[in-house]
Amino acid sequence: FNLHGGRDSAYWYGQRDPTYAADYPLFPVALRPDNIPVVPHPEAVVFSEACYGAHIFNKQEMSSLALRFLATQAVGVVGSTALAYGSMAPPLVGADLLAKVFWERVKAGCPLGLALAQAKQSLAQEMMTGQGYLDPEDHETILSFVLYGDPTLVVQADSGDETLNLSYKANEEVQSPGPPFQRAETVKGGETTGPILCRRRVVETGLVSPELMARVRHRLASYLPSARQRDVIVSAQMLCHEAHCNEQCSLRQSMAKGNLPAQAKLVFTLRQRACTLEDDVHQQIVKATVDGEGNVVKLAISR
């Protein structure tokens, strides 16, 4: 399910097509717990990309779709306990990439738990290769997605048959996800440390050219047309290779002087809040990462 969700909502939501009339609900209800029939679903595996799709704290079967699926005997439910981010266009990021690799591993015969672990590792490796770091949205994806169900369960479909065959792998049969991804390391003062991504809000508007601000705002507006463009928040981010810098890294010092380091990237964040027909408030967030040449190198939007 590639739908929206909310922390306090029992439903998962769609999103209004830009070509629809403005009076059409911005987030129409797509799925309710009572839409899931009471008949058992002993062969179902569910992956939800919705924000809070697996948030079950203080919830019951009819206030959580994840619990509803489990109550109808779904063998596995994967979802996020927090915000979930995905792509608006290729390449895949966040929950979209995680879901893709998860289903590939399940189809290849991996147990559900191993499939999710390998999907997380693949996401981390791909982001490290492409970006050189894991940003906060990558971290949230890796940490927030969980599996409810038996992690040793293997789900396979016979060729030409819609029926799924269920089997289990004992602990000794389940292989590890594989070698950990590699990251750059530096040594300072005899201490080894990996690079840390520093992200700081840009308060001095002169650090961002009006032309770049206008161009990125226009890009963000195409995804969240109802949001107020003046509410765009800009942050600078770069890798810090200094251990225990006590917030005296080059990014902080440069920004204090009214400059941005050449290797710094800018992250533009826009939020939109809207009430659903059930009076739940849904917040949607879109983040665009822009390199030093003004190119949008990553675009992530919350589910």
Language-model segment annotations:
Residues 3-9, 31-38, 64-68, 134, ...:
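Generic recognition of flexible, low-complexity loop/linker segments
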Residues 45-172:
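Active-site-proximal C-terminal subdomain of hydrolase catalytic domains
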Residues 171-211, 295, 300:
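Preferential activation on post-signal-peptide N-terminal prodomains/segments
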Residues 205-257:
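Short, non-transmembrane alpha-helical segments in secretory-pathway proteins
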Residues 195-208, 218, 245, 258-269, ...:
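Compositionally biased, non-globular sequence tracts
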Residues 236-287:
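Exposed beta-strand-loop-beta-strand "reactive/processing" segments of non-cytosolic proteins
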Residues 1-59:
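Catalytic-core segments of thiol-dependent peptidases
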Residues 280-300:
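A short, surface-exposed beta-strand/turn
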